[in-house]
């Protein structure tokens, strides 16, 4: 169904909002200022920051987004096609939730696919699929995506799926996973994508919570050196769970054995697609849930973030040019997993809404086949901008410190590298700049927000050479402030709670699935009138945010609040350590003292005792004796989630001899046993 009201005006990079306007940002000194780590008290927030640090267009946009959010986002929404105009741009009828584009109707699949074809862009490449684990490469045009998505929508409708029903997608990093997401969106079904290979128990919990009418899955996932059978994992999840979906739609991966189908329950993807009728887009209200995304490490009642359709479409389309500085048609690569929020926002919806080509990569930064993989993909596909996690960069650096494998590739089209997902230490940042030879920009956001909270908005003229260690300035719409526990605003460089003054902008979550009480309690009760990010950090005088750690990771040393992230950065800057996690170890005298778990670089010749002595001295010089840092242990590897995060709370429990739970998102759970052995010998 084609919208009849406000037809989309193609974003060409010259619109009033979202236009790339590079400006002339001032170049900042490369020196790393000593961190202000002990909490202080004063007052500062994004609203007050209008210093002369470059990016006049950014300042205008940010000020407008705070002063008149309805007008600001109403303008941005004109870049999206609507079936029915909204009656109110913003409404706070049910605080703390904010409704955007009230009573407006749209379809995000239409905006991501159909409208580009209607504008004559059907032959443009929508998806580049690059799978080193299967030695497969494919380019898929917008027309080809539409053909697959509209037929798959027809398959779902034939099985009784209708607007408001839920569908679980349990698939690897293949185009069919994106088709499934868009097909659900096309008919107004709510998808819940759970990354392939997720353990049966946790998969069962999510299926029971979301109660899907259909589960869409694949026969296998492929990891380096091994094949992951999805059906046994899914069968076990359904066996131990309460909810039984009506149908399983199974995609058998080519050149692999077919999985047997259960008569009356299972459907073969290819067979159903061959006889399917294409289905048109179904209009939905702006507040209609597009998807449910469960946050990693969920315990107790599942925490399923609900994403409203209209605001998400507006925000993602706006960010592609305003934050990432891209023009339609350019190639974009978010090196993440579709099962995480980055995959939802910036592998699937964001680039397609904006008319970009999105790279879908089924591989790893190293091991598929080597540490030159990222360079190959960037060169081969003419990628303009890459978004990855710092842990991926560290993995490349650890295996190839001089980036020798990357030197054979020409990166002539590559303009910018964005990192997020965890703090990017200065050492990793500087190495990335050196080997990729482009600006490397850290930015910060959360599953709940769906898009960046702070960033270097290069499309709005922000500096491409911000100070090391920062995570950008407030994205328009996000009025970030630093508060102490008594809701007092803190002065610049004082460590405190990072909060966002309400209302949240379009695209942020509208609730937790079947758990609105937890939504209110977790995020809005501690600081009334604000969204509690549960992260700790500080702002400098120029308005740059430094995200230091989760609030729970602030270590209380003899009454002083010390950021674990700051100590980690100091350890990494010494040059002998390639990865580090700092946790608080209980101490009878000081309450807690920091303990560093370190992974040494391959080329370090000194003994562990010598390295420890040097690191302790280095941390004392860069942070001061207040950190009380005296101990570290050396391990072969740190545990990481699939999105590259270190499970610090689990490590903290382990270090302190307490029971701990290994979440199903951990890539290699055996690392915990190794760390336990190291700690027994060292402490």
Curated annotation (Swiss-Prot):
Catalytic activity as recorded in UniProt: acetate + ATP + CoA = acetyl-CoA + AMP + diphosphate; propanoate + ATP + CoA = propanoyl-CoA + AMP + diphosphate; butanoate + ATP + CoA = butanoyl-CoA + AMP + diphosphate
Annotated family: Belongs to the ATP-dependent AMP-binding enzyme family.
Transit peptide region: 1-29
Keywords, in A-Z order: Acetylation, ATP-binding, Ligase, Lipid metabolism, Mitochondrion, Nucleotide-binding, Transit peptide
Modified residues (N6-succinyllysine): 514
Major localisation: mitochondrion
UniProt cross-references to CDD domains, sorted A to Z: PrpE
Residues where ATP binds: 421-423, 442-447, 535, 550, 561
Name by which UniProt lists this protein: Acyl-CoA synthetase short-chain family member 3, mitochondrial
Induction cue: Expression is up-regulated by fasting.
Role description: Catalyzes the synthesis of acetyl-CoA from short-chain fatty acids. Propionate is the preferred substrate but can also utilize acetate and butyrate with a much lower affinity.
GO BP annotation list: lipid metabolic process
Leader sequence residues: none
A Pfam family it matches: ACAS_N
Record gene name: Acss3
Organism: Rattus norvegicus
Lineage, opening ranks: Eukaryota, Metazoa, Chordata, Craniata, Vertebrata
Tissue expression notes: Expressed in a wide range of tissues, with the highest levels observed in the liver followed by kidney.
GO molecular function: acetate-CoA ligase activity; ATP binding; medium-chain fatty acid-CoA ligase activity; propionate-CoA ligase activity
N6-acetyllysine, modified sites: 520
Location relative to the cell: Mitochondrion matrix
Residues noted as binding CoA in the record, renumbered to the chain: 223-226, 620
GO annotation, cellular component aspect: mitochondrial matrix
EC number: 6.2.1.1, 6.2.1.17
């Amino acid at each position: 169904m084609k919208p009849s009201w406000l037809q989309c005006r193609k974003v060409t990079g010259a619109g009033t909002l979202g236009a790339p306007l590079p400006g002339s940002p001032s170049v900042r000194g490369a020196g790393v200022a000593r961190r202000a780590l002990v909490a202080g008290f004063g007052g500062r927030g994004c609203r007050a920051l209008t210093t002369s640090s470059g990016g006049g267009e950014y300042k205008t946009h940010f000020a407008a987004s705070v002063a008149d959010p309805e007008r600001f986002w109403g303008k941005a929404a004109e870049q999206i096609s609507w079936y029915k105009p909204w009656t109110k741009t913003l409404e706070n009828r049910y605080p703390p939730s904010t409704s955007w584009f009230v009573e407006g109707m749209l379809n995000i699949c239409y905006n991501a696919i159909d409208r580009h074809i209607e504008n004559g862009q059907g032959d443009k490449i929508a998806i580049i699929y690059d799978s080193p684990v299967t030695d497969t490469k494919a380019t898929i045009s917008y027309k080809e995506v539409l053909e697959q998505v509209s037929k798959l929508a027809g398959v779902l409708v034939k099985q009784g799926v209708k607007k408001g029903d839920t569908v679980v997608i349990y698939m690897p990093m293949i185009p069919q996973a994106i088709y499934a997401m868009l097909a659900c969106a096309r008919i107004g079904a709510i998808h819940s994508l759970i990354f392939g290979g997720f353990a049966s128990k946790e998969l069962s919990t999510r299926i029971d919570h979301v109660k899907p009418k259909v589960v869409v899955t694949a026969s296998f996932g492929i990891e380096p050196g091994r094949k992951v059978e999805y059906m046994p994992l899914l069968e076990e999840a359904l066996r131990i769970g309460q909810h039984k979906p009506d149908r399983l739609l199974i995609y058998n991966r080519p050149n692999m054995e077919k999985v047997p189908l259960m008569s009356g329950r299972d459907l073969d993807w290819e067979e159903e697609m061959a006889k399917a009728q294409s289905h048109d887009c179904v209009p939905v209200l702006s507040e209609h849930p597009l998807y449910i995304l469960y946050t990693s490490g969920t315990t107790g009642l599942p925490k399923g973030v609900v994403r409203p359709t209209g605001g998400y479409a507006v925000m993602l389309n706006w960010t592609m040019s305003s934050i990432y500085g891209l023009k339609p048609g350019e190639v974009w690569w978010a090196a993440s997993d579709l099962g995480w929020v980055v995959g939802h926002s910036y592998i699937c919806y964001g680039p397609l809404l904006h008319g970009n080509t999105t790279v879908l990569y089924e591989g790893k930064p190293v091991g598929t086949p080597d540490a030159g993989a990222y360079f190959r993909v960037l060169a081969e596909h003419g990628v303009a901008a890459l978004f990855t996690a710092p842990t991926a960069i560290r993995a490349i650096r650890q295996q190839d410190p001089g980036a020798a494998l990357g030197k054979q590739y020409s990166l002539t089209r590559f303009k910018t590298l964005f990192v997020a997902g965890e703090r990017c230490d200065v050492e990793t940042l500087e190495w990335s700049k050196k080997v990729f030879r482009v600006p490397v920009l850290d930015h910060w956001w959360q599953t709940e927000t769906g898009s960046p909270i702070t960033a270097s908005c290069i499309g709005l003229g922000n500096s491409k050479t911000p100070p090391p260690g920062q995570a950008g300035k407030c994205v328009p719409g996000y009025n970030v402030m630093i508060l102490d526990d008594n809701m007092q605003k803190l002065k610049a460089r004082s460590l405190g709670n990072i909060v966002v003054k309400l209302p949240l902008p379009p695209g942020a979550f509208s609730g937790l699935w079947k758990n609105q009480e937890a939504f209110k309690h977790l995020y809005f009760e501690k600081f009334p009138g604000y969204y509690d990010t549960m992260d700790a950090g500080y702002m400098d005088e120029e308005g740059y945010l430094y995200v230091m750690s989760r609030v729970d990771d602030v270590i209380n040393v003899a009454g002083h609040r010390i950021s674990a992230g700051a100590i980690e950065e100091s350890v990494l800057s010494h040059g002998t350590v390639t990865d580090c996690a700092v946790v608080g170890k209980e101490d009878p005298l000081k309450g807690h003292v920091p303990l560093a778990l370190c992974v040494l670089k391959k080329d370090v010749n000194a003994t562990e005792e010598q390295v420890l002595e040097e690191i302790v001295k280095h941390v004392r010089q860069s942070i001061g004796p207040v950190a009380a840092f005296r101990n570290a242990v050396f391990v072969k590897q740190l545990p990481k989630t699939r999105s590259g995060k270190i499970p610090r709370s689990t490590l903290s429990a382990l270090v302190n001899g307490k029971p701990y739970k290994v979440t199903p998102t951990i890539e290699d759970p055996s690392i915990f046993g190794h760390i336990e052995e190291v700690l027994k010998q060292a402490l």
